[in-house]
Amino acid sequence: MALSAAHCDTWSESIVGALPGTTWHHRSFTEEIYCRACGLVLDWAGAILTPHARQLIADAIIMKGLPRIESDFKRMEYIRHMNQGIVFSSGRILGALSLLPLYPRYASLIDEAERDLHEMIANYVHDDGGTLEGMAYWSYTFSSVMPIVWALARYRGQTPAAYATDTLCKTGAYGLGMLSTVGDGTHYLAVNDAHLGGHYPPGLCAAYAGLSGDRRWLALYRSAMKAGEGVPDIYPV
């Protein structure tokens, strides 16, 4: 997958984003996805790739992914006050971390991206731990955050629980507070963007169980896995 993606001409959202003469770009959604995926391949499987293959993937992250992401962070202020900037941080940080064995100067980008991540989480989460978007967006946003927290904790030589900020833990308590009391109590309330019957993904539940020590998250994780609601993600790996 990573080698195929690295051979694509562009990681832009559409042909319009790479059309000569255009100034339009649909934000760095696909660039984030490919930076994240290719970064994980370099980190987890880089040792079994040839040096040339590693270089191809690294070059693609550097030239096709990170520049578009950096453009959004430098130009689009609004992404710092909603979930987009937080989600884009996944590809930005995991991609940059994967480059360090080849290019240690990317450490400065990691420092900047880490500061941005915590700033944006603080912007997104209110004093009571809540957010203005519904629980489906909340779930998606913090499912994107957790792998970054684990990766940055490893990079900084800390446990995830020690690395996690008070804001991140506080909004986890909000997630529990937004569970419905109807039925088995494992679904979140259908407010704002959320539909009836929505539930938090097992990976997010497992992550918050580890960060908070709250056994309710562990119960949610076990319930979701027992119901066969798990989807492939990075946590089982």
Set out the residue ranges of the language-model regions.
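Sec/Tat-exported extracytoplasmic proteins
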Residues: 9, 42-45, 149, 179
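Active-site lining segments of carbohydrate-active enzymes
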Residues: 21-136, 146-147
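Short coil/turn segments at secondary-structure boundaries
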Residues: 16, 76-80, 186-194
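Carbohydrate-active enzyme catalytic cores, enriched for enzymes
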Residues: 99, 137-237
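Long, well-ordered core segments of solenoidal/helical folds
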Residues: 2-15, 56-76, 108-129, 166-185, ...
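Short, glycine/acidic-rich hinge or "gate" loops at secondary-structure transitions
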Residues: 15-20, 51-57, 157-164
